[in-house]
Each structure stands twice: as structure tokens, then as C-alpha cells.
Regions:
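Nucleic acid-binding interface residues in structured DNA/RNA-binding domains
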Residues: 1-98
Length: 98
């Protein structure tokens, strides 16, 4: 079953600074569900920029990149270096799991 909006937004709030997660990690099997929850969100303090596509590409372009760079999220070209990934269920970054 897909997570609720509240569960998705709680997971986004839990993403540590300097890390990212994917839409699919927020809503396994239904990444568009996570996108819809973020689009409907009214909380200006939600760290939406920490949610990226599975391949590390950005949905919100330059604004998202600037915010992530300010958090020292690493990039490889135009994409986030997914070694900065954090999986909500595991609560650990990819580098911590390696």
C-alpha cells in the first residue's frame, strides 16, 4: 500500500542535511505519489529540494541545485552523486551502508 501524504512528508522532514532521497524511496512502487504529496504541500520549511529522481537528476532545476549545493550535497555533472542518498526505511546513507 502506498504511504499517506503525512507519511511521505514526515520522511522528507527526516532526510538529513547534505543527503537526498528519491521519489521511489519515499513511495516504493509509486514514485508519482510522492511527487503529488510534495506538490500539494503548503509547508515552506519542508526540505523538498532533498528529493531527487532515481538517477540523481533534478526535477526543479537550478533552484534545487543551488539549495542542495548550499547543503554541500555532491554532484557529478548535472546529477546528484547518489552516494549522498539516504533511504528513509534504513535511516542510513549509501556510504554508511557500504
Amino acid at each position: 500500500m502506498a504511504p499517506t501524504d503525512a507519511e511521505i512528508l514526515a520522511a522528507v522532514r527526516a532526510i538529513p542535511r547534505g543527503h537526498v532521497t528519491t521519489y521511489g524511496d519515499l513511495s516504493p512502487g509509486a514514485p508519482r505519489r510522492a511527487g503529488a504529496a510534495l506538490a500539494a504541500n503548503a509547508d515552506p520549511g519542508l526540505p523538498w529540494q532533498r528529493v531527487v529522481r532515481a538517477d540523481g537528476s533534478l526535477a526543479k532545476g537550478e533552484r534545487q541545485r543551488r539549495l542542495l549545493e548550499a547543503e554541500e550535497v555532491p554532484f557529478r555533472g548535472a546529477r546528484v552523486d547518489m552516494r549522498a542518498a539516504w533511504v528513509p526505511a534504513a535511516g542510513a546513507s549509501a556510504s554508511e551502508r557500504a
